[in-house]
Amino acid sequence: MAELRKKRERGLPAIARARQDRSSGRSRWTTQAGLLAAALLVAGLIAHKVVSERGREGDRQALLAKQRAVAVTLGPEWFPLRDKLEGDVLAAAKDFAGDHVDPQARRAEFRTQPGLYLRMRVAEAKDAASVRTVAADARKDAFAACLLREPNERGARGDADAGAFAEQPWNLGQAYAATRILTDDWVGEVKAADDDLRLRIFSRQYDKAVRDEIPVAIDVVKRAQFFLLVLDEDVPEAVKPADGGPLTEEALQLVPHPSRVHLFDLTTGKELLRLLRTGDARVIPAGERAVADEETRDAMQRQANNCALARRVDEAIAPPPAPTAAATGN
């Protein structure tokens, strides 16, 4: 009987199958239905993207608004100071103008005051951008530690590990790092952030800056009294043929070389000190066991040379001896 019904079916087989599907409650996708489903899917994705972009843009504008509030508060004090410091560095990197010791420097009041410190090679001081790049990686060295006598406030408070590192002077790189969220570069990166993850990273950077770094920047602009600058002149002895790499600040500090030492009063803008001196010292091992590690020996040699440079500066700024009775004719 089924075979007879099958033989009697007329029309296209596809139409017959469609009739059977409808009668049994089943349905088949048509081209129109597939296109409609695809269109709905694309529309949903577009709607999700639009909503996400609107939310991201709202978060971006909120972050930039908070950044502008900090910039309005701190920027008018930090940016002029930054520009002045960079101008002093670039001017000092030109032809050396000869030694100069202001009477105020001889009083050595700066040694116990809060201030800023930067040391770099003369050859690297090309423009403001190069100063910022070098300062970001610069570290304090034994020269500042041997020359300055900043009171250890953390030690006086009894803070743990207060003696590990002197608080003063601030490294100029600390000031740059503390004020990074104020820069046009940072704002540009926030504006260019094209996904939620990158925007969250910038939001965390802002939160960290406000919590930990902006207080340092406020301290710098409010308390810093002087800017101590050391510019090291290159010498061929600092280049090790075996290394084959570029000359570095650490390599220079291992060998005797001329160093330009400048001191600026940040309250008046006056240059108090300008010296060209060479730090040269010899490390003499003591004890039964000599230091075998090359890295440790190099660190000791740099420390000795830098403290020797500080002694040369000490000698230059020491008050002249009082005239004797024979000199005055009495």
Residue positions per predicted region:
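N-terminal intrinsically disordered, acidic low-complexity segments at the extreme N-terminus
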Residues: 1-19
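Short, Lys/Arg-rich cytosolic juxtamembrane segment immediately N-terminal
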Residues: 19-30
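Hydrophobic membrane-insertion alpha-helices, especially the h-region
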Residues: 31-49
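Transmembrane signal-anchor/signal-peptide helices with a preference for the extracytoplasmic
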Residues: 43-61
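Extracytoplasmic low-complexity, Pro/Thr/Ser/Ala/Gly-rich segments
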Residues: 56-139
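N-terminal segment of the mature soluble domain
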Residues: 118-230
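Surface-exposed short loop/turn segments
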Residues: 204-266
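Short secondary-structure boundary motifs at beta->alpha junctions and helix caps
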Residues: 267-319
